[in-house]
Swiss-Prot record:
One of its GO terms (cellular component) is plasma membrane. Pfam families: ATP-synt_B. F(1)F(0) ATP synthase produces ATP from ADP in the presence of a proton or sodium gradient. F-type ATPases consist of two structural domains, F(1) containing the extramembraneous catalytic core and F(0) containing the membrane proton channel, linked together by a central stalk and a peripheral stalk. During catalysis, ATP synthesis in the catalytic domain of F(1) is coupled via a rotary mechanism of the central stalk subunits to proton translocation. The chain crosses the membrane at residues 5-27. The lineage of its organism: Bacteria, Pseudomonadati, Thermodesulfobacteriota, Desulfuromonadia, Desulfuromonadales. This is ATP synthase subunit b 2. The keyword Transmembrane applies. F-type ATPases have 2 components, F(1) - the catalytic core - and F(0) - the membrane proton channel. F(1) has five subunits: alpha(3), beta(3), gamma(1), delta(1), epsilon(1). F(0) has three main subunits: a(1), b(2) and c(10-14). The alpha and beta chains form an alternating ring which encloses part of the gamma chain. F(1) is attached to F(0) by a central stalk formed by the gamma and epsilon chains, while a peripheral stalk is formed by the delta and b chains.
């Protein structure tokens, strides 16, 4: 098989363009959002610190009062001392409880916000990547996007080890397979994909195709509880891990600066 170096070079250039666009339009907004979140968290921790200082000041005031009362040495002194000590414990417990609630609410907010962020990120980046990939591949190469997806997926099937192949083939022979893609594959590409699946898993396998506009760019084959796929979802997962690491590092920095 001859390698079309022009196509390979074009795809490499396309990938670099895509990385540059992601860096320009994705990481910048993410960092700004984290900066705003850091400011809000710093304000919350400052409020908690003020309450702690107020409780500490109250404790110091009560200690001073205790010292004065101790000089009186009487029955009333012990009663007042007990009341003051009880009140001190209540105030400190309330301050600690409020600080703990603020920190717990902040942690829950971080988890919810990050989950929502990555859900929206996958949705938006997936849509933009699909449009960019279609246009770029159409401009820079003669291979259509759908054809490239089918070729890569067939290569993925051919690379299965013997155990994986036997496991999937057994399930497929009993239940058939369902192939999903984000857009409708032309008949000739469906035939090519069907041929690749049957060569890898068995000639008598029943196949069904389904369009899923909400799925990431790629092809997914499911057999019962088994799933094989090739697409950009793995890149999303790596991007999610990278951003999560950055997000957690920022949150840890704020936590270390808190009391």
């Amino acid at each position: 098989m001859l390698i079309d170096w022009f196509t390979v070079s074009a795809q490499a250039i396309n990938f670099l363009i895509l990385v540059a666009l992601l860096k320009r339009f994705l990481y910048g907004p993410v960092l700004r959002a984290m900066d705003r979140r850091e400011e809000r968290l710093a304000s919350c921790f400052a409020e908690a610190e003020n309450k702690r200082l107020e409780a500490q000041q109250l404790e110091e005031n009560y200690r001073s009062l205790l010292q004065e009362l101790e000089e009186a040495r009487g029955v009333k002194l012990r009663q007042v001392e007990e009341e003051i000590e009880d009140q001190r414990h209540k105030l400190l417990a309330a301050a600690r409880q409020e600080a703990a609630e603020i920190q717990s609410a902040w942690a829950a907010s971080i988890r919810d916000e990050r989950s929502s962020f990555f859900t929206e990120l996958k949705k938006r980046v997936g849509s933009e990547m699909l449009n960019i990939a279609r246009k770029s591949l159409g401009d820079l190469a003669n291979i259509e996007l759908e054809q490239l997806m089918v070729e890569r997926f067939n290569e993925r099937l051919a690379q299965l080890d013997r155990n994986e192949q036997q496991q999937v083939a057994l399930a497929a022979s009993e239940r058939g397979v369902l192939v999903r893609s984000p857009f409708t594959l032309p008949p000739e590409l469906r035939d090519r994909l069907t041929q690749g699946v049957r060569q890898a898993l068995g000639e008598e396998i029943d196949m069904q195709y389904q369009d899923r506009a909400d799925m990431p760019l790629g092809i997914e084959l499911t057999v019962g509880g088994l799933k094989l796929s090739w697409g950009v979802d793995s890149y999303f997962e790596q991007l999610e891990r990278d951003v999560a690491t950055l997000y957690d590092a920022q949150a840890a920095t704020v936590s270390e600066g808190s009391p």
